[in-house]
């Protein structure tokens, strides 16, 4: 099963926390975006995030993949205090090829992916032909507010950080 994961962190050693996800999926990564510095989304009175997108081929079911991401978040001691608040690690399933779900535990595609520069810009960098709900990710990036696009800063590939 091919899945698109958006990963992010804005607490502690952000690079090392993202690296744990890269390491966990090392043998299953088909493509990876550079790491980007991004402003917080939703709740803006918090530190800047580091974000990246991984495209992975995995054997597990969507729910098993969700649990795998949650285990990584738990290992990073993520505490869910405030919706869209600071976090040590966030592992979101953005899309799964050939799969949709409106289960409140796992919405696929991710219900906010189409409006989040911190998801779309890294995803486009990882896969120039990416599509979300039938529309090209490049088109969705072009439709973002130019100010929002400008706030996303490429830092480099994970192995360079």
Predicted regions span which residues?
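Short histidine/acidic/glycine/proline-rich micro-motifs that form metal-
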Residues: 12, 55, 125-127
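N-terminal beta1-alpha1 ligand-phosphate binding loop
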Residues: 1-27, 32-39
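Short beta-strand-to-loop capping motifs
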Residues: 9, 54-60, 95-98
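Flexible, gly/pro- and Lys/Arg-enriched active-site loops
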Residues: 31-33, 41-50, 63-67, 71-161
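Amphipathic, positively biased hydrophobic alpha-helical segments used for protein targeting
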Residues: 17-19, 53, 128
């Amino acid at each position: 099963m091919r899945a698109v994961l958006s990963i992010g962190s804005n607490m502690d050693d952000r690079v090392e926390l993202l690296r744990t996800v890269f390491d966990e999926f090392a043998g299953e990564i088909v493509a990876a975006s550079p790491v980007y510095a991004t402003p917080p989304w939703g709740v803006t009175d918090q530190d800047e995030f580091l974000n990246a997108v991984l495209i992975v081929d995995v054997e597990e079911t969507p729910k098993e993949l969700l649990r795998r991401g949650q285990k990584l978040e738990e290992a990073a001691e993520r505490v869910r205090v405030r919706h869209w608040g600071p976090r040590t690690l966030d592992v979101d399933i953005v899309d799964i090829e050939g799969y949709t779900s409106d289960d409140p535990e796992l919405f696929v595609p991710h219900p906010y992916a189409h409006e989040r520069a911190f998801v779309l810009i890294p995803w486009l960098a990882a896969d120039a032909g990416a599509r979300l709900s039938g529309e090209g990710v490049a088109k969705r990036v072009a439709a973002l507010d130019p100010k929002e696009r400008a706030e996303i800063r490429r830092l480099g590939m994970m192995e360079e950080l």
